[in-house]
Regions:
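Phosphate/dinucleotide-binding and metal-coordinating scaffold of catalytic cores
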Residues: 10-288
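Hydrophobic h-region of N-terminal signal peptides that target proteins for export
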Residues: 2-10
Length: 288
């Protein structure tokens, strides 16, 4: 009985309906409209499914209509296949409005689903995108405002567009179509990992996140708690983002160990007495 109930709960948890006011029907808007068609399939958190996407954008100051049959001559910004999943940890668990991650692909996953780089709503060409779901933020502009405040000072900041989202004919509300951080001409300027004369070369991208992935690196240091003391019950874990763990098999031997050593060297410096040293201190590891 317990296993049966657990399975039913898991299935229900992945069929998230629109949030409050589910009876609201989108008719027209000055924002682009993103139509996602999953053909009734269940959207999951860990595995991607094949879906279709169609983006209507008649231009700045123009009205976009949700009834495609009644308005067949609207401008289609992009139409094609995507691999779709839910995304986020806190943003997923603490919100009734679920964020999505998707990659643009040339054909369905069942037929190979090779990724294809495209420009969506004027954003730089790439294949990795997210739909942020402003739920607690009733202004729906805090994420975008933060991006814009950081843009003059950082080498790269995600660009984004507010959009209306419709999934399988149901209106899900206003989302923020956003570039996902990653390696690419229009994203982060990272060099491919490789080898030169026995030395490992290239760039790696990791992030501090929860230890809910199958493979991660746990720091040998514990974090500080709210009262300024070390909390030995908690851990700092690094997730492999680029390259991902699955890519290590195709990279030079020792790549994972090299990433871990780089993390150790950085943290040892931060925890050492000479962390302020102008040459070998934190400036060696952080772009300040």
């Amino acid at each position: 009985m317990l296993l049966c109930l657990t399975a039913l709960y898991a299935q229900r948890a992945d069929n998230y309906p629109p949030t409050k006011n589910a009876q609201v029907k989108l008719s027209e808007t000055n924002l682009p409209i993103v139509f996602i068609d999953v053909d009734g399939k269940m959207i999951l958190r860990e595995e991607r499914i094949t879906a279709k996407i169609k983006i209507i954008d008649n231009g700045t100051g123009k009205t976009n209509y949700a009834d495609l049959a009644a308005h067949p001559d609207q401008k289609v910004d992009y139409e094609g296949y995507i691999s779709l999943k839910y995304r986020g940890n806190s943003s997923f668990n603490s919100s009734d409005k679920k964020p999505y991650g998707f990659k643009t692909i040339a054909k369905p996953l069942e037929e190979g689903g090779k990724k294809v780089k495209v420009s969506l709503l004027g954003l730089g060409k790439d294949n990795d995108w997210v739909l942020l779901a402003p739920f607690a933020d009733k202004t729906m502009i805090r994420d975008v405002l933060t991006f814009e405040l950081g843009r003059p000072y950082l080498d790269w900041v995600p660009s984004s567009r507010h959009v209306e989202v419709v999934v399988d004919g149901k209106y899900y509300g206003i989302y923020i179509l956003t570039e996902r951080p990653g390696k690419g001409k229009n994203r982060l300027n990272l060099h491919d990992p490789g080898e030169d004369g026995g030395d490992l070369t290239g760039d790696w991208r990791v992030e501090i996140d929860r230890d809910d992935e199958d493979h991660y690196y746990r720091s040998k240091y514990h974090p500080y708690g709210r009262y300024g003391t070390v909390d030995n019950t908690k851990y700092i874990t690094y997730q492999y983002d680029d390259p991902e763990y699955e890519d290590f098999a195709d990279l030079p031997a020792g790549t994972e160990k090299a990433i871990q050593k780089s993390i150790d060297d950085m943290e040892d410096c931060f925890a050492g007495d000479n962390y302020k040293d102008p040459v070998n201190g934190y400036r060696k590891y952080i772009d300040v």
